[in-house]
A protein has these predicted regions:
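Radical SAM [4Fe-4S] cluster-binding motif and immediate context
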Residues: 207-271, 278
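Glycine-rich phosphate/dinucleotide-binding loop and adjoining beta-alpha-beta core of small-molecule
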Residues: 3-187, 249-426, 498-499, 510-516
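Phosphate-handling active-site elements
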Residues: 15-32, 448-461, 470-475
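Short, small-residue alpha-helix embedded
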Residues: 376-377, 433-464
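Long, highly charged low-complexity segments
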Residues: 181-214, 276
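Short, well-structured alpha-helical segments that form the helix of a local strand-helix-strand
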Residues: 390-398, 454-469, 483-491, 507
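Charged C-terminal helix
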Residues: 467-516
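Short pre-catalytic strand/loop immediately N-terminal to key active-site residues, enriched for Gly-Thr
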Residues: 207, 422-435
Length: 516
């Protein structure tokens, strides 16, 4: 394994120079004649403790009890599990010491029955170099001996294991430090973590003499009597993500409920059967769909037979060719249109999964936005297989289906058929609530309508959505977040991204809110 002891010794020296009292606890002795960093630490007179001279770990236990900061600089990239022998025992002692320091307060409860808020942190802050010792950097596997960190500092580029669980859950906040690596070294890498600089470059300009057509027209087919909120959230997100005009095509029976909340949209009222879109509504869309720059299909549609028939009719003969069929009866036949760039979400995906040869029915350049359950249905495989290797599965299916795929979840994956892949740097339990997927789909279709390519719209939309989610969580915590809270912060997320100067370090660094 590639060890990080040298990095730890350098950190010890700089901390000492800054005035900290530093002790270095080493698993094995170092030779100062060949280890320059160890020699410099010795010359500074820093305390050096050896595991080989600490048979019952008493000195290690005492050091952890007294420490304000613990720096884990043992194992790095190249680690293979399991961790064994003295190293496993050493990490176990550190973990036990930290756990003892984290014991809850023994003070009496307040009159309301709640424990008092702590005045200050009373246990060490753990910093991991590259990652906790015991993290496998390719798979994200985490040894049981690993010590979870509060902050992980890695260099040049993040590693795949930083975004795969369970290891990703043990990093705390992740910081990618710029060490002057030549960008040309990564020029041919197709897998990237989305950064603010990337999103800023993709977002369209907003000229002073613009009109609403400048920023695109988005058509959203969504909603049913049981899911009025999905239509509202998707439509409102599209307006908040910059689309010039948003039209909601929805069952006429829910129009009043949605329009009362979303006054900025226009509406196309569709025929319905008991509150769900009816099959013959396809001919109504056929008369209007070519007026729009992007189409979102699916949020809250439901899966009734009428709606399934509607989706089948709408997609009949798609694939980018002018279609020679008709929608409706002979008396009211309307030529099938060429669909604008398409985003499919939620029940649209579930209906696709029930159709034979569904990938051939989609126009090129479509974006599919499944959560793991929907992805499993589209693939015909169990969810466990989807989650086992999210990056590889998303890349494979994007190529197989010939469309951009957005696999939602902690560290959302965006993959294009040509192999380009983005990992979105957000893992937020507050987004695990109803409606947040509708907000994401609305953001993506808005960016597609503004002229972004399918991959760029998907990656940028997921970044805006994730950043808005993190802003919401920072303000109100994860437990009480709603999709509407995230929706309200989309403009702030956009402003935050475009407000960052291109010379800032934010483009090469990544900060994540700590877990919990």
């Amino acid at each position: 394994a590639c060890e990080r002891v040298g990095d730890g010794l350098v950190a010890a020296r700089y901390l000492a120079e800054a005035g900290a009292h530093v002790a270095c606890y080493l698993l094995k002795p170092r030779d100062p004649t060949v280890d320059e960093n160890f020699r410099l630490v010795q010359e500074r007179g820093l305390a050096i403790l050896l595991a080989s001279e600490d048979g019952k770990w008493h000195r290690l236990q005492h050091t952890v009890r007294e420490a304000d900061v613990v720096v884990d600089a043992l194992l790095g990239t190249g680690t293979r599990l399991p961790v064994r022998g003295a190293l496993a025992k050493m990490l176990d002692q550190v973990r036990r010491g930290l756990a003892a320091r984290r014991q809850p307060s023994r003070e009496p409860l307040t009159p309301l029955g709640a424990p008092p808020l702590p005045a200050k942190r009373d246990w060490p802050f753990v910093v991991a170099v590259d990652g906790p010792s015991g993290l496998e950097y390719d798979s994200g596997a985490l040894d049981r001996a690993a010590v979870p960190a509060d902050l992980t500092v890695t260099f040049a580029y993040p590693k795949l294991g930083h975004f795969r669980f369970p290891g990703a859950g043990a990093l705390g906040e992740l910081l990618v430090a710029d060490i002057g690596t030549d960008p040309a070294l990564a020029a041919d890498v197709a897998l990237e973590v989305t950064t603010p600089d990337m999103v800023r470059a993709w977002l369209p300009p907003r000229p002073l003499d613009a009109h609403k057509g400048t920023f695109g027209k988005a058509l959203i087919v969504a909603g049913s009597v049981n899911y009025t909120g999905a239509a509202y959230l998707a439509g409102a997100a599209a307006t908040r993500a910059g689309a010039g005009l948003v039209t909601l095509a929805l069952p006429a029976t829910i129009h009043a409920a949605v329009a009362a909340r979303l006054t900025e949209a226009t509406y196309l009222l569709l025929h319905h059967e008991l509150g769900v879109v009816a099959a013959d509504a396809a001919h109504m869309l056929a008369e209007h769909v070519e007026e729009y720059d992007a189409l979102l299909l699916g949020p809250g549609l439901g899966r009734e037979r009428e709606t399934e028939a509607f989706v089948e009719l709408l997609l009949r003969g798609a694939g980018g060719r002018r279609r020679m069929g008709f929608v409706g009866t002979e008396e009211s036949a309307t030529p099938l249109p060429v669909l604008p760039p398409l985003v499919v979400d939620a029940d649209g995906l579930n209906i696709l999964a029930s159709m034979k040869n569904w990938p051939k029915r989609l126009p090129p350049g479509s974006v599919l936005t499944p959560h793991p359950g929907e992805m499993a249905r589209l693939m015909g495989h169990p969810v466990s297989e989807v989650q086992a290797d999210r990056v590889a599965v998303t890349q494979s299916q994007a190529t197989t289906w010939g469309q951009v795929v957005v696999l939602k979840g902690a560290y959302t994956i965006v993959a294009a058929p040509d192999g380009r892949t983005a990992i979105e740097p957000f893992a937020n339990p507050g987004l695990a609530t109803a409606g947040t997927g509708d907000v994401l789909a609305g953001a993506i279709v808005a960016l597609r309508a503004q002229g972004l390519g399918a991959f760029e719209a998907a990656a940028a939309g997921a970044y805006l959505h994730g950043l808005a989610g993190d802003m919401t969580r920072a303000e109100m915590g994860a437990a009480g977040m709603t999709a509407g809270d995230v929706l309200a912060r989309l403009p702030q997320a956009w402003l935050h991204i475009i407000g960052l100067s291109t010379g800032s370090q934010t483009g090469s660094q990544y900060h994540r809110l700590p877990s919990g």
